[in-house]
Amino acid sequence: MTTKRKPYVRGMQPNWWTKLGFYRFYITREGTCLPQLWFSLVVLFGVFALKNGPESWAGFVGFLSNPIVMLINIVTLIATVFHTATWFKLAPKAVNIVVKDEKLPQEPIVRGLWGLTIVVTVVILAVALIV
């Protein structure tokens, strides 16, 4: 048996996610993809500038020295650190590591991830300064 009545569809406001802190946090975290897109485009532009010779590279460096670009890059760095911190807090929840019949606490995993990040960053900076 079918009916000709329309089913009730509850209205959804465009700002529904602002009412709960969890959703605001989630949308903010997922919104960090926009600064990551900026960073990816800047790196891609830099690679092509490097490929096209010294004049092109000088133009790219000039572009990076623009105060607005510096501000956008600082915002991108902050967004990246925020995204990394939240990701490192989520990672132990997805991994179930058992040591001697006990689940490994989250803190050693998070500390290990931050330690690895610091080591890799120092190695990359050292290589960049040596070469």
Curated annotation (Swiss-Prot):
Membrane-related topology note: Multi-pass membrane protein
Sample GO molecular function, one term: succinate dehydrogenase activity
Lineage start: Bacteria, Pseudomonadati, Pseudomonadota, Gammaproteobacteria, Enterobacterales
Record's protein name: Fumarate reductase subunit C
Location in the cell: Cell inner membrane
NCBIfam families named among the record's database cross-references: PRK04987.1 (NF003445)
UniProt entry keywords in alphabetical sequence: Cell inner membrane, Cell membrane, Membrane, Transmembrane, Transmembrane helix
Species this chain originates from: Proteus mirabilis (strain HI4320)
InterPro entries: Fumarate_red_C, SQR/QFR_C/D
Spans traversing the lipid bilayer: 30-50, 58-78, 109-129
GO cellular component: fumarate reductase complex; plasma membrane
A Pfam family the protein falls into: Fumarate_red_C
